[in-house]
Every structure is written in structure tokens, then in C-alpha cells.
């Protein structure tokens, strides 16, 4: 693609991400954090992919800009049928954007399932710890395990990575199965 077709395609992408064609002549130093993120989204969609990997896409943005970017991603997902693999440490963001969630601990999969199920009925203790660290706790309920209790150490060669700190360890099952 060259010349006027290229410019037209870029202008269309900029409109999709709620920026005007006049952004084509701007330098990065002239853009806010949210505008830079929208440009990154436009670039990701330029090749019209079926799947986009979003790695910490909202991590450096303030809450209002995060909401705008998530709203944009949701709109584009519905409009273009794109699938996202969304990597984030921010569980509120994950909950807002995801249909399915996979929880990793020390690089190993602990839990995977529909977002609603994972958040309402976590089946792995580490998932419970993560959710408990974000949601408002009930002051009358003492958590069995809190995020501060988790000390990073080398994961075991086999079995669940969380077995050394888990309050619900199931003997050989947790020691031998992932």
C-alpha cells in the first residue's frame, strides 16, 4: 500500500481509535500518555489481526485514561471480532475486559475458566489471595492467607507451584500434579 491509499488507511485507523487524521503529523513528544496508547492500539489493528496480545496495556495510565482505553478495546473487539490475550497484574482491568481468565503463579498455570466463575468461585488458593488483595475485605473475616505472607522462592520441580504456602494442600495431589 502506498501514497493516498496508505494515508487514507492511517486516517481511518486514527478515527477508529478516536483520534483525528491530524495526528498523522504529530511527534510522540507531542502526545499524552492516553494518545500514545491509542496510537499503539491503532498500530496493532493496522494488519487486521484476529488475535492481539495486550501486555500491561493500561499499566502506566491514570484511571480515567485506563477506562477510555478499555472502552476503546471493547468497542473494537465488538466491531471487528478481535480476540485479545490480555496480560496484566491489575485484576480490576482483567475483570473489566475478559471473558476467560488464566491465573499464573511463578510461570505455571493455576486456574483457568470463565471470568465470572474465576472471580466469584476461585478454585485455587493463589487466585483467592489475588482477589482478596484487590477486593474490599470484610473487617469481620480474618483471611487465612494474605499476599504479604507469600515469599517468592524457586518453584518445586513438580506439582503445584503454590504448595509450599498453601493452606489447603491436598497431600500427594498438590505435590505431584500441576
Show which residues each predicted segment covers:
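Conserved ABC ATPase "signature" region
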Residues: 5-22, 131
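Walker B catalytic motif
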Residues: 27, 56-57
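Conserved ABC ATPase signature
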Residues: 27-31, 35
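Hydrophobic anchor residue at the start of the ABC signature
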Residues: 41, 53, 69
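A short, proline-enriched helix->beta-strand linker immediately N-terminal to the Walker B motif
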Residues: 46-50
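P-loop NTP-binding/switch modules centered on Walker-like glycine-rich loops
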Residues: 57, 61, 65-140
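Short catalytic/signature loops enriched in Gly
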Residues: 114-178
Amino acid at each position: 500500500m502506498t501514497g493516498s491509499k496508505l494515508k487514507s488507511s492511517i486516517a481511518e485507523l486514527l478515527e477508529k481509535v478516536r483520534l483525528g487524521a491530524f495526528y498523522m503529523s504529530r511527534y510522540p513528544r507531542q502526545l499524552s500518555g492516553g494518545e500514545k496508547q491509542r496510537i499503539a492500539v491503532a498500530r496493532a489493528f493496522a494488519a487486521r489481526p484476529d488475535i492481539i496480545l495486550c501486555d500491561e496495556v493500561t499499566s502506566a495510565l491514570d484511571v480515567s485514561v485506563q477506562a477510555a482505553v478499555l472502552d476503546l478495546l471493547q468497542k473494537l473487539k465488538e466491531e471487528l471480532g478481535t480476540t485479545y490475550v490480555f496480560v496484566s497484574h491489575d485484576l480490576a482491568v482483567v475483570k473489566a475486559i475478559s471473558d476467560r481468565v488464566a491465573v499464573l503463579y511463578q510461570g505455571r498455570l493455576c486456574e483457568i475458566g470463565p471470568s465470572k466463575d474465576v472471580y466469584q468461585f476461585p478454585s485455587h488458593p493463589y487466585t483467592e489471595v489475588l482477589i482478596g488483595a484487590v477486593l474490599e475485605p470484610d473487617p469481620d473475616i480474618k483471611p487465612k492467607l494474605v499476599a504479604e505472607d507469600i515469599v517468592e522462592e524457586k518453584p518445586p520441580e513438580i506439582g503445584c507451584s503454590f504448595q509450599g504456602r498453601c493452606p489447603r494442600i491436598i497431600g500427594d495431589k498438590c505435590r505431584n500434579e500441576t
